[in-house]
């Protein structure tokens, strides 16, 4: 088996070039522009060029993945914050709804009592007595500054108030 002196000499020169090339840190490798990187890679073996380019790509991908993880964590925290705010709002509205239902039930009871009283008065006067029509005033109770409910009495579009 004979060794070709030219190929061993070329291999020796390539090794010397590889050994003599300045080692680039990961930060420096990532910070280089493509033009600067290509300038650095001139004169290196194809193996060394491939290795450095692959190393640079791996480092850049790592950075992209890390920033993606950070972004995802921030989005998750923001969504959890929004969820908590919405849950508090739902609880508040449920409490307000329950309070309004109680108030409505109390008003229905008063209305029914008044209607019963009106029927008993009408029955005591007898069937021949005409009862003058009465106007109904609706009082809406709301918390100050809530802005709910009519501002100036009942809505004429909905007709007279009833208990049901």
From Swiss-Prot:
Alphabetical UniProt keywords: DNA-binding, Nucleus, Repressor, Stress response, Transcription, Transcription regulation
GO molecular function terms attached to this record: DNA-binding transcription activator activity, RNA polymerase II-specific; DNA-binding transcription factor activity, RNA polymerase II-specific; RNA polymerase II cis-regulatory region sequence-specific DNA binding; sequence-specific DNA binding; sequence-specific double-stranded DNA binding
PROSITE patterns: BZIP
Record keyword Ion transport present: no
KW Transcription regulation (keyword) present: yes
Stretches for region Basic motif: 51-76
Region Leucine-zipper: start-end pairs: 79-93
Any GO CC annotation of this UniProt entry: nucleus
Low complexity composition-biased segments: 149-164
UniProt subcellular location: Nucleus
Tissue expression summary: Expressed in the term myometrium and kidney.
Subunit architecture: Monomer and homo- or heterodimer. Interacts with MIP. Forms high affinity heterodimers with members of the CNC-bZIP family such as NFE2L1/NRF1.
Function: Since they lack a putative transactivation domain, the small Mafs behave as transcriptional repressors when they dimerize among themselves. However, they seem to serve as transcriptional activators by dimerizing with other (usually larger) basic-zipper proteins, such as NFE2L1/NRF1, and recruiting them to specific DNA-binding sites. Interacts with the upstream promoter region of the oxytocin receptor gene. May be a transcriptional enhancer in the up-regulation of the oxytocin receptor gene at parturition.
Family: Belongs to the bZIP family. Maf subfamily.
Protein name per its UniProtKB record: Transcription factor MafF
């Amino acid at each position: 088996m004979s060794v070709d002196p030219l190929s061993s000499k070329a291999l020796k020169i390539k090794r010397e070039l590889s050994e003599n090339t300045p080692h680039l840190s990961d930060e420096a490798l990532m910070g280089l522009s493509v033009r600067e990187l290509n300038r650095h890679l001139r004169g290196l073996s194809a193996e060394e060029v491939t290795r450095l380019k692959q190393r640079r790509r791996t480092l850049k991908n790592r950075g992209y993945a890390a920033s993606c993880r950070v972004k995802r964590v921030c989005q998750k925290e923001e969504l959890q914050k929004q969820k908590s705010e919405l849950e508090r709002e739902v609880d508040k509205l449920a409490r307000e709804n329950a309070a309004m239902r109680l108030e409505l039930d109390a008003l229905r009871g008063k209305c029914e009592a008044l209607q019963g009283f009106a029927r008993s008065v009408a029955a005591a006067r007898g069937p021949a007595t005409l009862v003058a029509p009465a106007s109904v005033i609706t009082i809406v109770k709301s918390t100050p500054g809530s802005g709910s409910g009519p501002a100036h009495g009942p809505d004429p579009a909905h007709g007279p108030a009833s208990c049901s």
